[in-house]
Each structure stands twice: as C-alpha cells, then as structure tokens.
C-alpha cells in the first residue's frame, strides 16, 4: 500500500532486466496512509494494469479484534468506493471487542481519564492514543510524565501508561485503548 511511482519504476527496470522474474507483493489498501512516503494508491488498486497478469488473494480474517469493531470499522472504510471491497471477519465468532464512549466536560478531561484507568483491572495493559503527538497536552498538567528513549508514559492511578499517536501504535496491541481527543474539534478524529 506504500508503493510510489519511484518504487514502481525501480521494479519495472528490475523486471525488464530479468523477464522471467515474478513479484510477490503484499499490501492492504485499508491500512494505507494517504500519500505516505509518496505512495500512489492507483499503483496498488490497479496493480494488474501496471504489473501485468496478477493473482489476488484477499486476507479477510483478522486476529486482532472481534465484533462489533469488525462490522463498524469495515462499514466505515467501505464507504470509500475507491477501497477494495472485502468481507472481514474475526478468526473467532466468540471474540468480542467492546467499545465504550464517554462524554466529558473539558474541565473534567483528566479526571475522566483517571476514572477510566481506575476501572481497568491492574493486570491489563493500556494505551493512550491520540491522533497527534500533542493530544496528551492536558494530561501533563495533572499526571507525571516519563520519557524513556523515544517513548512517553503517564503515571495515572499508580500505573505507568504509554502514550502514542495512532500512527506509531500500528502493529502494537493493548488490552484497553483509550482514544484521546475523540471529538469533532479542529484536531479531533
């Protein structure tokens, strides 16, 4: 999903130098980040037009989460007609990924986060995720922050909890994820 015109041209030259060469490509347009690293989704979504005869195998099973998140996320992504249509399902029909939404007054933002953390069993892992690296700004007024290398943590209710952007969290897992600034503001989700 991150293929650019430059990368395409490089692969094209390699293939022209060795005509029997085959490509084995893996990607997921649902995970693409618009124009990340110069990517051009046309190269991915119209792969056969650029690379020739193609066999496509869709991976439609997720091992990361269950319903209702499978349905909600798939429905959201497939609203974009340019996305490759897929029928995503969880590897286990018994696996559930519960979603909870909390309304809060801006003045109670940090207290609301503290209450959420306090309600999570201590043996469960937690991530604080923001869209932007500054989404943790208000937390720094109430909670101790710790920087270890390039990782940031907040001590909330005696627990050290990592803060990441959604982009940096790609591929990571936690038992509980708290999305910060999940609103309709200028910098919200």
PLM region spans:
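Conserved Walker B
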Residues: 1-3, 29-30, 169, 182
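Conserved RecA-like helicase ATPase core segment
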Residues: 5-96
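Generic beta-sheet signal
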Residues: 23, 124-130, 161, 177
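Short beta-strand/turn micro-motifs composed of small residues
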Residues: 27, 130, 181
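Short catalytic/ligand-binding loop motif for oxyanion handling, primarily in non-cytosolic enzymes
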Residues: 32-35, 65-68, 135-138, 172-173, ...
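Helicase P-loop NTPase motor core
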Residues: 53-55, 61-155, 169
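Conserved helicase C-terminal RecA-like lobe
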Residues: 122-125, 169-189
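Conserved two-lobed SF2 helicase motor
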Residues: 159-168, 176
């Amino acid at each position: 999903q991150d293929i650019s015109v430059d990368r395409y041209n490089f692969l094209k030259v390699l293939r022209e130098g060795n005509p029997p060469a085959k490509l084995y490509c893996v990607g997921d347009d649902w995970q693409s980040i618009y124009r990340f690293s110069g990517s051009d989704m046309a190269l991915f979504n119209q792969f056969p037009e650029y690379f020739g005869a193609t066999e496509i195998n869709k991976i439609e099973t997720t091992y990361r989460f269950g319903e209702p998140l499978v349905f909600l996320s798939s429905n959201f992504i497939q609203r974009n007609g340019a996305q490759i249509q897929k029928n995503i399902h969880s590897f286990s029909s018994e696996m559930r990924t519960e979603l909870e939404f909390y309304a809060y007054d801006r003045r109670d933002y940090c207290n609301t986060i503290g209450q959420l953390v306090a309600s999570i069993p201590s043996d469960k892992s937690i991530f604080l995720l923001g869209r932007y690296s500054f989404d943790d700004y208000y937390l720094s007024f109430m909670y101790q922050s710790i920087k270890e290398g390039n990782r940031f943590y907040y001590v909330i209710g005696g627990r050290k909890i990592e803060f990441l952007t959604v982009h940096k969290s790609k591929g990571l897992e936690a038992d509980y994820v708290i999305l910060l600034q999940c609103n309709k503001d200028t910098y919200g989700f």
